[in-house]
Regions:
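Long, charge-dense low-complexity segments
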Residues: 1-146
């Protein structure tokens, strides 16, 4: 999903989240690719992105995935998501995710967010924002059927 680019172009309705290139070595970038590939369907739907390509410049990694919003909490949720995604890619020993259909999108993505570290009251609003575009029940894998 990476796409080298010399001159970054800003789109007025896009929010681009950037991280320093020096934070991600080649192994971390490979892990990032696998994580994104493994959750691409859910990530795209959750954030409303058409593409999950990221751009690498000499000193930055840019994620132009998000739609600009006036809501500071929503922007913060997107920034935190990229930060946690990069952190997972840096610290993971191995990544073996396959993008597969899920019956309950909201539950599957909530579990993914928890694995990324969106745990506790401080991330409650971010989880809510990142889950709002998905279908299903976030609390129960089978939608509450037991």
């Amino acid at each position: 999903p990476k796409q080298p680019q010399e001159q970054p172009k800003e789109e007025p309705d896009k929010l681009t989240v950037e991280i320093p290139r020096k934070l991600m070595n080649d192994t971390a970038l490979a892990n990032l690719d696998r994580i994104i590939e493994g959750k691409s369907t859910l990530i795209r739907k959750a954030i409303g992105a058409d593409s999950l390509e990221y751009e690498i410049t000499e000193d930055r990694i840019r994620f132009p995935w998000f739609t600009m919003t006036e809501d500071a909490e929503e922007n913060k949720a997107y920034i935190t998501f990229i930060s946690k995604l990069a952190e997972q890619a840096r610290t993971a020993k191995r990544v073996t995710l396959k993008d597969k259909p899920v019956d309950n999108e909201k539950y599957a993505f909530r579990c993914f967010l928890l694995r990324l570290g969106f745990i506790g009251e401080e991330y409650k609003e971010a989880r809510k924002i990142l889950l709002k575009n998905l279908t299903g029940n976030g609390a129960w894998k089978n939608g509450g059927d037991r």
